[in-house]
Amino acid sequence: MKFTTGNDNRNGSVSAKASKAEPREDYYNIDPSKLYVKIKRTLSQRDGAGAGQIEVTLETSSEFVGFQKENYECTGLTFTSKGTIKLPQDAQAMATGVVQESIWMGVRIAQAGKVHLTASVLSDMDIAEVRLQGPAFDKRVYDDFDDTLDITTPGEYILKGAYQLAVRTPNASLGGRPISVEIQATLTPVS
C-alpha cells in the first residue's frame, strides 16, 4: 500500500529579544510551489551581549518519503524537530526566547488497512505533542509510541507535530540550563 499525498502545512519560527531591543526573528513556511518536498532547516537567532545573551534554535526536517510527483504518492511520512533556548548567564538579565514548530502532513488512504506509527516526544515541559488524526481515530502521543494501528475507515489522515517553547527571564525557577523540546514521528503502511 502507498499513500496519496494530501495536506501539507509545515512552518516554524524563532525569536530572541534581550532588554528593550526589537526581537531578532527568523521563520520558515512551506512554499506552495514546493509542496511535499523534503525540508531540512536550521533557524537560529541570538540577542544581547556577554552574560545577557539569549539564543534560540530550531532544527527541523520533514519528508513525504519516496514522493512521486507524477501520481502524488509516497511511501511514508517522517519528521523530526528540536527547539532549544539557551538562557542568559546573568540570572537577572531581561530576555525573551520563543521557538515554535507546526507540522501537518496529510495522506489519503483509499481502503482499510494497517499503518505503523513510531513517535516520541522529549520535553522539559508539557508543551508538545505528536498526533495522527483521521476518520477512524485520533491518536495523541506525549512520550513514546511504537505500534501498528488499524485504519478501519478510509479517508484523509494527518500526521501532526507541534510545540511552542517560550521563556521570559529573569526567572529563577528555570535554573539557568538550556531548555529544549524534541519531537519525531514516522508513519508507514503495513503490507
Regions found by a protein language model. Give the residues of each.
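Short, solvent-exposed S/T- and G/P-enriched segments that are highly enriched in secreted/extracellular
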Residues: 135-149
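Extracellular beta-strand-rich recognition modules
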Residues: 115-121, 157-167
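Short, surface-exposed beta-strand/strand-loop-strand elements in extracellular ectodomains
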Residues: 124-137
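C-terminal edge strands of extracellular/lumenal beta-sandwich accessory domains
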Residues: 2-39, 43-67, 71-72, 160-191
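Extended extracellular/luminal ectodomain segments enriched in beta-structured repeat modules
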Residues: 108-116, 154
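Short proline/glycine-enriched turn/loop motifs at strand-loop junctions of beta-rich domains
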Residues: 110-113, 121-127
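Short beta-strands within extracellular/lumenal beta-sheet-rich domains
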Residues: 87-108, 146-147
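Terminal (often C-terminal
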Residues: 55-97
